[in-house]
Swiss-Prot record:
SMART domains: RAB, RAN, RAS, RHO. It is found in: Nucleus; Nucleus envelope; Cytoplasm, Cytosol; Cytoplasm. PANTHER family: GTP-BINDING NUCLEAR PROTEIN RAN, RAN GTPASE. This is GTP-binding nuclear protein Ran. Monomer. Interacts with RANGAP1, which promotes RAN-mediated GTP hydrolysis. Interacts with KPNB1. Interaction with KPNB1 inhibits RANGAP1-mediated stimulation of GTPase activity. Interacts with RCC1 which promotes the exchange of RAN-bound GDP by GTP. Interaction with KPNB1 inhibits RCC1-mediated exchange of RAN-bound GDP by GTP. Interacts (GTP-bound form) with TNPO1; the interaction is direct. Interacts with KPNB1 and with TNPO1; both inhibit RAN GTPase activity. Interacts (via C-terminus) with RANBP1, which alleviates the inhibition of RAN GTPase activity. Its cofactor is Mg(2+). It comes from Onchocerca volvulus. Belongs to the small GTPase superfamily. Ran family. Residues 210-215 are annotated as: Interaction with RANBP1.
Length: 215
């Protein structure tokens, strides 16, 4: 854990296929320092995001690939000293979920046992292809999973809160002020939200498949 301005600071590695909403996820947060840094050697943007908790302020330096993943795998320098990670996929594109194990493998190889959240983005889109019952990778690898929607801010604070609790070893830690987010561009249908949450709860109790048919 690095400290800058006496604020506990963690390197958060954000990975996933191109077009899954990683940059949008970062830019929806208005808590970031506009002085983002660009690491030209790695083709990476580093966005500082500050969260206010009952344990004081916490800063994530979020490493965003700036589209580099479209040209093949990321360099190890992107992952080195990563202390936590978010793997993002698009629930409307099955191939982005099928590639999750590849991103996890690279993270595990370089960063070993860091807390990781898997996020299925674009759950505001009605034509969902990757259903809750088929999302089992996180259970096999002991990751946390959340449905999220970048455009509606649905569940947006949950990945960050879960990671902070893990990093500080405090399951009771809370945000004292909700993260400042850009206004939602779309509204989630409450009926759809209730259905998805019910499906995720049911999937959490279902038996895991023996093989990787879910991928």
């Amino acid at each position: 854990m690095a400290t800058g301005d006496d604020i506990p600071t963690f390197k958060l590695v954000l990975v996933g296929d191109g077009g899954t909403g990683k940059t949008t996820f970062v830019k929806r947060h208005l808590t970031g320092d506009p002085e983002k840094k660009y690491v030209a050697t790695l083709g990476v943007e580093v966005h500082p995001l500050i969260f206010h908790t009952n344990r004081g302020q916490i800063r994530f330096n979020v490493w965003d690939t700036a589209g580099q993943e479209k040209f093949g795998g990321l360099r190890d320098g992107y992952y080195i000293q990563g202390q936590c990670a978010i793997i993002m996929f698009d629930v409307t594109a099955r191939v982005t979920y099928k590639n999750v194990p590849n991103w996890h493998r690279d993270l595990a190889r370089v960063c070993e046992n860091i807390p990781i959240v898997l996020c299925g983005n674009f759950v505001d889109v009605k034509d969902r292809k990757v259903k809750a019952k088929t999302i089992t990778f996180h259970r096999k690898k002991n990751l946390q999973y959340y449905d999220i929607s970048a455009k509606s801010n649905y569940n947006f604070e949950k990945p960050s809160l879960w990671l902070v609790r893990k990093l500080l070893g405090d399951p009771n830690l809370e945000f004292v002020a909700m993260p400042a987010l850009a206004p939602p561009e779309v509204q989630m249908d409450p009926t759809m939200v209730a259905q998805y949450e019910q499906e995720i709860a049911a999937a959490a109790n279902a038996e895991l498949p023996d093989d990787d048919e879910d991928l």
